């Protein structure tokens, strides 16, 4: 059975990015673990709730076949410069990130010399990713080897479809 850990913010992660990807992983028979900064209940942007089974300090990315970083503004405020978040990205065998999450992940260096996308607000996220060595492109979804990135909830369906292809390899 394939294993995945989904990293979300404790307060205000993007519902559709999470639920579409979670459901696709379930259909692919993946064993899914939810993790957040703190091991407690996580609240979606639109109010739904899930429980994080692990705190980020307890997660090791190399123990899972894939690591998925879910975005939204609170992921930025909670995880920017977070050592555990960045460590997990570095340990990931296969890395998926959507919305603002690719920008936050880029600080780990895993996108160095790789082509990625993300949500972008007037060039800020693009500049941040490029500062840490990534090559940003304005596309809904980009797959670069074992990395899949997407620019936001509108690309969630394309994102999970590409992710499931990678999962099955």
Report the location of each language-model feature:
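Extended, subdomain-level signal for the structured scaffold at the beginning of enzyme domains
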Residues: 1-94, 103-115, 123-169
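Catalytic nucleophile serine of serine hydrolases
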Residues: 99
